[in-house]
């Protein structure tokens, strides 16, 4: 019996068999991704698809400087507010930057007709030619062109007026009827602006225009309107009780525009031949101009990124990532990062892909760890790793290419009377934005799930490849490991890794060792049966002796009486 127990203990203590394990790479990465089924999965490698940073500056767009209006609004710039004179030298720009609260707009109070539409038109203009449509000195010989100034449009402390308009007044006590036309020979659209003066009282009307009733008529192929001055007292704005209403039209190449009036005309002086450019726009921003270049400009600042999505601002100009409301869009490229606990032993927690990855394997995603008499070591499976890298890289590039539709997204212009339309437009835009955000997030979740499943499948395939080679020359011991029934030196280990393992060569040795182990198991089973019987009998005897002793003690002290009746 003692000899049999000794054999059993010796057999159980033998743990020096050669072993090979299949596992995967792990590192100290803290990157986390979300999948359809899980959140915050730690992975070895990932790529960010969402840009959330900017430089806080206005930059040149593709090397072309923007038109920074400074303290001027679009209206002040295009009408020629004297305080905006420094902007007249700007002939071309990449985009127009306007501050939220521009001081210099329409210096003489009044209504600017279709102002939001004009802004929309100018948002697609990248350059223009400013030219005299009606030269000041020779176009109006019967009218005064110098006295039409006002303190509300002062410049350097003196009364002045818009630099692109002429306020025609009476000359030598009369204001003759006028008729002036212009033919567009610029081969481009020409922007023409004019105004109609509405005095606050009849005395001003007579003093300036020498008549009580007046009209202004403007006609072209696409525009036909007749204006009648409205003489009325109004609240003072910028010191004025009168008003000037401002109007504009786009004159097509070859078209003619005709002005007729007998008073109250604020005549065009300069007009603009427009050149439209793709990617231009108007942004409202407090950011300052800087010496920098970018491909994408937002009101918050410039974005220099090739990522497909951004959450900086919905208004963009240039080649910009698509705006989404997401706070995180990270796509996994590596594996689940579950580093094994080194202290639990080589073939314990770090044995394979079931319990964790290997931080010691740094030259590939999947691979092997072996242990034999010659030592131990890691080796990556380069073929499966490279195939996985190629597949995932192509997928990531494809996703970025499909979603990376870069474009300009500018805000739409609405006036105060179009509030319901603006609110409806915002709801529609919000709906599209929600769809874009949902699609982007769902795409990333699905692709992350597929990538992690892909890695799991690759590890399993590598495991099955080894298992199919070894067959019954080794046994599975869990954790992705196999224990050989034969000695396997480094050459043998290498053959398993590269798929050239010679099964017949090791079959006989494996068979003998397998039978020896099976014999020990059978003998051990017999020993266990004897031990079980012995233990049962010994336990029963101990129980009977204990019961007898208790009964004798109870009878001796009278606690238990035994009567035998015959």
Swiss-Prot record:
Keywords (A to Z) from UniProt: Clathrin- and caveolin-independent endocytosis of virus by host, Clathrin-mediated endocytosis of virus by host, Disulfide bond, Fusion of virus membrane with host endosomal membrane, Fusion of virus membrane with host membrane, Glycoprotein, Hemagglutinin, Host cell membrane, Host membrane, Host-virus interaction, Lipoprotein, Membrane, Palmitate, Signal, Transmembrane, Transmembrane helix, Viral attachment to host cell, Viral envelope protein, Viral penetration into host cytoplasm, Virion, Virus endocytosis by host, Virus entry into host cell
Chain positions of site Cleavage: 344-345
Cytoplasmic side: 551-566
GO biological process: clathrin-dependent endocytosis of virus by host cell; fusion of virus membrane with host endosome membrane; fusion of virus membrane with host plasma membrane; viral budding from plasma membrane; virion attachment to host cell
Major localisation: virion
Membrane topology qualifier: Single-pass type I membrane protein
Assigned GO CC terms: host cell plasma membrane; membrane; viral envelope; virion membrane
Name of the featured protein: Hemagglutinin
Protein source organism: Influenza A virus (strain A/Kiev/59/1979 H1N1)
């Amino acid at each position: 019996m003692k000899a049999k127990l000794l054999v059993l203990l010796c057999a159980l203590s033998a743990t020096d068999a050669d072993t090979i394990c299949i596992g995967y790479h792990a590192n100290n990465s803290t990157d986390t991704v979300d999948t359809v089924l899980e959140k915050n999965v730690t992975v070895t490698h990932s790529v960010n698809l969402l840009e959330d940073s900017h430089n806080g500056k206005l930059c040149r767009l593709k090397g072309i400087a923007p038109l920074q209006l400074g303290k001027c609004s679009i209206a002040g710039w295009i009408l020629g507010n004297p305080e905006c004179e420094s902007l007249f030298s700007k002939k071309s720009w990449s985009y127009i930057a306007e501050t939220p609260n521009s001081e210099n707009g329409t210096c003489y109070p009044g209504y600017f007709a279709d102002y939001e539409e004009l802004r929309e038109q100018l948002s697609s203009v990248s350059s223009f030619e400013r030219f005299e449509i009606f030269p000041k000195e020779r176009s109006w010989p019967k009218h005064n062109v110098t006295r039409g100034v006002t303190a509300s449009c002062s410049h350097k402390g003196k009364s002045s007026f818009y630099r692109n308009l002429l306020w025609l007044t009476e000359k030598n006590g009369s204001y003759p009827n006028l008729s002036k036309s212009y033919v567009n020979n610029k081969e481009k659209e020409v922007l023409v602006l004019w105004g109609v003066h509405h005095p606050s009282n009849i005395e001003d009307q007579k003093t300036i225009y020498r008549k009580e009733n007046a009209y202004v008529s403007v006609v072209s192929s696409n525009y036909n309107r007749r204006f009648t001055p409205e003489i009325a007292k109004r609240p003072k704005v910028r010191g004025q009780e009168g008003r000037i209403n401002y109007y504009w039209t786009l004159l097509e190449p070859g078209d003619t525009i005709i002005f007729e009036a007998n008073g109250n005309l604020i005549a065009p002086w300069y007009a603009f031949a427009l050149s439209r450019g793709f990617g231009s726009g108007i942004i409202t921003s407090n950011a300052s101009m800087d010496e920098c270049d970018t491909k994408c400009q937002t009101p918050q600042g410039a974005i220099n990124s090739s990522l497909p999505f951004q959450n900086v601002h919905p208004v963009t100009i240039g080649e910009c990532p698509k705006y989404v409301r997401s706070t995180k869009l990270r796509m996994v490229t590596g594996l689940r990062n579950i580093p094994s606990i080194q202290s639990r032993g080589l073939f314990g927690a770090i044995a394979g892909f079931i319990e964790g990855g290997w931080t010691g394997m740094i030259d590939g995603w999947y691979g092997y760890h072996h242990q034999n008499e010659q030592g131990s070591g890691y080796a990556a499976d380069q073929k499966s790793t490279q195939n996985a890298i190629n597949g995932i890289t192509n997928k990531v590039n494809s996703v970025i290419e499909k979603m990376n539709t870069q474009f300009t997204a500018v805000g739409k212009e609405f006036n105060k009377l179009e509030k319901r339309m603006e609110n409806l437009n915002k709801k529609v835009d919000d709906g599209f934005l929600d769809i874009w955000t949902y699609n982007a997030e769902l795409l990333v979740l699905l692709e992350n799930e597929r990538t992690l499943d892909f890695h799991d499948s690759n590890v399993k395939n590598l495991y099955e490849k080894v298992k199919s080679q070894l067959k019954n020359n080794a046994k599975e011991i869990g954790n992705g490991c196999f224990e050989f029934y034969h000695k396997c030196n480094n050459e043998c280990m290498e053959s398993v890794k590269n798929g050239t393992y010679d099964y017949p060569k090791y079959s006989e040795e494996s068979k003998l060792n397998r039978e020896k182990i099976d014999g020990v198991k059978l003998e051990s089973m017999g020993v266990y049966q004897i031990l079980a019987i012995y233990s049962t009998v010994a336990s029963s005897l101990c129980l009977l002796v204990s019961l007898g002793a208790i009964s004798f003690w109870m009878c001796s002290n009278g606690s238990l009486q035994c009567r035998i009746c015959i």
